[in-house]
């Protein structure tokens, strides 16, 4: 049974750094289950697993035969949703904006025809070959180094101690790729490329997360407030001498939870579990349920080194 009737609006624009004054090439808006649209949001590893990047896959069913001719690789897709069919245009909420990959078409024996597109936050892998203005980071704090390499794009989810750590050994990087490779693992546990708050351009934010120390006065969002579908399931990993707990949670889709957020929930024994969102995925459809899947890193984990 579908509890919410989600609708979607997808606007397609020509490639541009700023689309606020552009008229979309095409607009696809669902009403009463037509056209059928499936959206899958997932995480893609890049730079040899050094960082995760949010991406989406669009599937549009039975569009006009010339639909793909109006779109090309590198065009921009802007995606919105609303939960109830009776809501107006002003009730649409922003999901993400990104660059289209090459279109893929599928024909099925029953006559259905699907146009499929990948939607990326970064224009291409060459993004990481961008030359840095500052190349030598010895003597700078981790926070200062990150903000120099990613001006206006960094969200730092690290403790004050980790932020203030001074780089005291060789740290020379001429490109973003080299910077990330030197940073990840040694100074930062996870770098996640997420969508920003802006909807008039492709606004990628780089989220830097460390798991082993508390981050100041973290605000915890109660998962029960977001229509949690079942009690999160624990997953145990063994890393060296450490036992690491993760939790997998599924809830109705919301745009209010992001990677790096603190969340809490009641486990099956009545205890309060606090965790950090490590990964997010979503399955969205205007003819089915829309769910958000979270992978959570338990804050009680203790990493034993050596």
Model-derived segments and spans:
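Assembly/oligomerization scaffold segments
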Residues: 1-122, 246, 276
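Short beta-strand-centered interaction patches in the first periplasmic/extracellular domains
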Residues: 107-128, 156-234
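Glycine-centered loop/turn motifs
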Residues: 74-76, 139, 260
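Short solvent-exposed strand/turn elements
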Residues: 109-131, 288-306
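Polar, S/T/G-rich
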Residues: 137-153, 172-188, 257
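An acidic/polar, Gly/Ser/Thr-rich interaction patch typically located in mid-to-C-terminal regions
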Residues: 41-72, 210-306
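Glycine-rich loop/hinge motif
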Residues: 134
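Short edge beta-strand segments in beta-sheet-rich domains
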Residues: 95, 114-116, 201, 272, ...
């Amino acid at each position: 049974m579908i509890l919410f009737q989600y609708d979607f609006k997808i606007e397609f624009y020509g490639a541009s750094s700023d689309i606020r004054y552009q008229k979309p090439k095409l607009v696809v808006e669902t009403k009463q289950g037509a056209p059928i649209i499936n959206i899958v949001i997932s995480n893609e590893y890049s730079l040899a697993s050094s960082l995760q990047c949010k991406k989406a896959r669009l599937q549009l069913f039975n569009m006009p035969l010339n639909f793909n001719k109006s779109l090309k690789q590198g065009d921009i897709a802007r995606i919105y949703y609303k939960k109830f069919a009776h809501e107006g245009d002003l009730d649409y909420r922003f999901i993400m904006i990104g660059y289209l990959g090459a279109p893929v078409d599928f024909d099925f024996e029953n006559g259905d025809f699907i146009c499929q597109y990948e939607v990326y936050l970064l224009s291409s892998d060459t993004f990481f070959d961008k030359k840095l203005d500052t190349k030598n980071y010895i003597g700078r704090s981790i926070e200062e180094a990150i903000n120099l390499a990613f001006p206006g794009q960094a969200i730092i989810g690290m403790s004050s101690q980790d932020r203030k750590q001074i780089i005291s050994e060789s740290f020379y990087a001429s490109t973003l790729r080299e910077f990330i490779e030197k940073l990840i693992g040694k100074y930062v546990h996870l770098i996640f490329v997420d969508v920003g708050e802006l909807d008039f351009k492709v606004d990628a934010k780089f989220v830097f997360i460390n798991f082993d120390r508390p981050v100041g006065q973290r605000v915890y969002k109660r998962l029960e407030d977001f229509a949690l579908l079942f009690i999160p399931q624990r997953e145990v990993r063994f890393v060296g001498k450490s036992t690491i707990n993760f939790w997998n949670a599924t809830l109705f889709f919301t745009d209010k939870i992001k990677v790096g957020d603190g969340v809490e929930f009641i486990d099956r024994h009545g205890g309060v579990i606090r965790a950090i969102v490590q990964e997010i995925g979503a399955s969205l459809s205007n003819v089915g349920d829309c769910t958000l899947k979270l992978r959570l890193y338990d804050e009680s984990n203790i990493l034993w080194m050596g």
